[in-house]
Regions:
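A common structural junction motif
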Residues: 160-168, 260-267
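Catalytic Zn2+-binding segment of zinc metalloproteases
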Residues: 56-66
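Solvent-exposed, non-transmembrane alpha-helical starts
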Residues: 43-45, 152-154, 171, 306-309
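Helix N-cap motif at beta-to-alpha junctions
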Residues: 147-150, 245-250
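Active-site His/Glu-centered metal-binding helix of metallohydrolases
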Residues: 50-58, 315
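Non-catalytic beta-strand/loop surface segments
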Residues: 1-42, 66-149, 183-238, 262-306, ...
Length: 356
């Protein structure tokens, strides 16, 4: 891109995977991201929260990584997958309890063949920092910060990780996700965001489901849906890689082709949604919580790529930028309010401007 201060080099592998490289020789490290263009918007309606808890499972290894005896482990994991499907379909609470007890027993048996935290140990041995991931409405992103001389080993490990993840230690990780969900229920900003999206996009997944999902769905997961989700969206033509730091772009391109070039592309299902009702009247929602009262205003606009969506971040920045926005100068620095800010939420299908 002309006049790009980051001098980002862009390349697309034959299988559709996009690469973004930016060289910076200041320190001998490379910051990495692997992004998948899928998020909670794409969760099946009956298993909301799936994109997020699958992100957690991407740290559990594959049939070659994280196992002590894959054949024995797989036989048990296959049973667990079927039991989760029975558990989800069952309506009798006593039967569900019995099924979950069997899931728990088999999970303990399968754990004997799992090498726990092997991925984390391998990236730690490389000298990686900031190993993490996050899921949002339309993206899931996996992060690392590695020494420059470990780039090929990182490529090798990540290609294995994305080849075919295994849902080992699943129900214990789901308990961690459910605890994250429970904590979020006490956070007023999450409740306000949810209420606002319900008003702005009442029949779109932006307004009908959240990234953390519904509690009842987290209690009734489907491993079959998870594998189907992976097969559908975790494909190279729906993924991008970012490298920034001390590396040779030509060498990185060769490594990307070597380790990710063999991944087979697939057609990505088009996302369809109903037109949202016109917002012709002011609609008020009162949300009750533990924090001091505040007022939030939001307006809906068209989605990413439209002129309106491109203007929203500029408008929000004019209002609030931590230093010289209109809110900064007139409200915060003049001590008229305890807190005030503005931001734009720009999603693919709809955007919004939020004033707080």
């Amino acid at each position: 891109v002309p006049h790009d201060p980051m001098q980002v080099l862009q390349h697309t592998l034959p299988n559709g995977m996009r690469l973004f490289f930016s060289v910076n020789k200041e320190v001998p490290r490379v910051y990495t991201e692997i992004a998948v263009r899928v998020g909670s918007k794409h969760d099946p309606a009956e298993t909301t929260g799936l994109a997020h808890y699958f992100e957690h499972m991407m740290f559990k290894g594959t049939d070659r990584l994280g196992t002590l005896d894959w054949n024995k482990e797989k036989a048990i994991l296959d049973q667990i997958e079927q039991l989760f499907e029975q558990h989800r379909a069952e309506t009798d609470l006593a039967v569900k309890k019995t099924l979950y007890a069997e899931i728990d027993r088999l999970s303990s048996e399968a754990a004997r063949f799992a090498a726990a935290n092997e991925y984390d140990k391998l990236v730690s041995a490389m000298g990686a920092k900031g190993t993490n991931a996050y899921t949002w409405v339309e993206q899931t992103v996996y992060l690392n910060d590695i020494p420059a001389n470990e780039l090929e080993r990182w490529f090798q490990l990540e290609s294995e990780r994305f080849r075919r993840p295994v849902l080992r230690l699943f129900h214990t990780e789901l308990e961690t996700v459910f605890e994250e969900y429970n904590i979020s229920q006490d956070r007023d900003f999450r409740k306000v965001m949810k209420a606002g999206q319900e008003v702005l996009t009442p029949t779109h997944p932006y307004g009908t489901q959240t990234t953390l999902g519904r509690g009842e769905d987290l209690k009734n997961p489907s491993q079959t849906n998870i594998y189907r989700f992976f097969d559908t969206y975790y494909v190279p033509n729906n993924m991008g890689m970012v490298l920034c730091g001390d590396f040779d772009p030509q060498e990185a391109l060769k490594l990307a082709q070597q380790y990710f070039g063999g991944f087979a592309p697939k057609p990505i299902p088009a996302f369809h949604f109903d037109p949202q009702p016109q917002l012709t009247l002011r609609e008020r929602r009162d949300v009750y919580g533990n924090e001091a009262p505040w007022v939030e205003l939001a307006w809906r606009f068209p989605g990413a790529g439209t002129p309106e969506a491109r203007m929203l971040p500029l408008l929000a920045g004019m209002l609030f930028n931590y230093q010289a926005g209109l809110f900064d100068l007139n409200l915060i620095q003049n001590q008229q309010v305890l807190e005030a800010y503005a931001y734009a939420r720009v999603y693919e299908d709809f955007s919004s401007l939020v004033l707080h």
